[in-house]
């Protein structure tokens, strides 16, 4: 699996970076002790050019995001197929596509560290994309409370703006965005979600002019969350265009480039 390559690559980079940072030059090597007399084989001195490390880092980041994008697009395609003709088989396929997309997102987290700025912007992205744990009942029904959640709230019109506004409104577990909100929609509270929960029905319009049918609202939330996920992951990937993180990294001194990569690795591992 290609994802494993991206998980292994950071480990290799860590070894390279550690070798660079800890390299012992002949000038700084300590004098050998006079006693006892021991014959040893000198350790090799690793002195990789910073351009090599930076190039490998950038190449891995861009490849990771490119493969992740394919998984997001596949997830979007499976979502549309499922909503067009809901069935238990298509729901299982959609759940599998979610798992693959989330796995790829997790593999690319190492490349989400800020370089010189915008740490708040990146933190917001991560918060909206991968918040955990979640209180599922804030979004949709749970067995003990079958009429709870935004989806079943007949006085709130659902939209992307509403979902963003309601996300962690009063508590960090009140999650209405990202992978785990989608996970709850697709599996339900007891992992026994039925495709019938997404069947389209005739609209049940409220006096305020929006649909209150829970299945239709669940379909709408699924559509909106996937669309927003694609938009946000695309923005993360765009950071590695020449005008984004790539330019910021290239502007750093070799020492700061190495420090940045090492800090990113330590935060990931």
Range-by-range predicted roles:
Residues 1-18:
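Sec-dependent bacterial lipoprotein signal peptides
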Residues 12-13, 25, 39:
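N-terminal non-cleavable signal-anchor helices
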Residues 20-24:
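Bacterial signal peptide processing site
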Residues 32-269:
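Mature extracytoplasmic or organellar-lumen-exposed domains after removal of signal/transit peptides
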